[in-house]
Amino acid sequence: MDERRSKPRLNVSLDAVWHGETGRQSARVTDLSEGGCYLDTVGEVMKGEIVAFRILLPDDDDWLYLEGEVRHHRPGFGFGVQFVDLNEEQTDKLSMLLRLANESGPEPFAISADLVEE
């Protein structure tokens, strides 16, 4: 685990859509914790930028809407965010996702979806 992180991240594979200064982009969340996540995407961001994104939740066609501050990025590969201003509903949904990912064992916990604009 990276020493900069205060919370351990779990290996996941979750479809996501994010919005930043460059517009709407598709992504895949590849690790997730209570404090942040990593998004695999070719879209460009700047360190410190606030991005809004959504992650598909299992079984009920519901989305988890989040905002995060870009903490690091690898141009053309993706970026890591630290969540900002989580409310109780977001925290509950995030906890549910983390519990499911933890129960899935060593294989990445995966949810895929058609990424259409709502």
Language model feature labels by segment:
Residues M1-L32, S95, R99-E118:
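N-terminal helix initiation/capping motif
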Residues L56-D60:
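Short, charged beta-turn/beta-strand-edge "cap" motif at the junction between a beta-strand
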Residues C37, V51, L64, Q90-S95:
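A short, polar/proline- and glycine-enriched secondary-structure boundary/capping micro-motif
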Residues V12-R54, G78-G80:
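Short strand-loop-strand
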Residues L66-G76:
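Short, compositionally biased
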Residues W18, D31, V70-H72, D85:
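A residue-level detector for short acidic-glycine micro-motifs
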Residues S6, V12, G43-K47, V81-R99:
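Short solvent-exposed strand/turn elements
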Residues R24-S26, D61-Y65:
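Short, mixed charged/polar active-site loops
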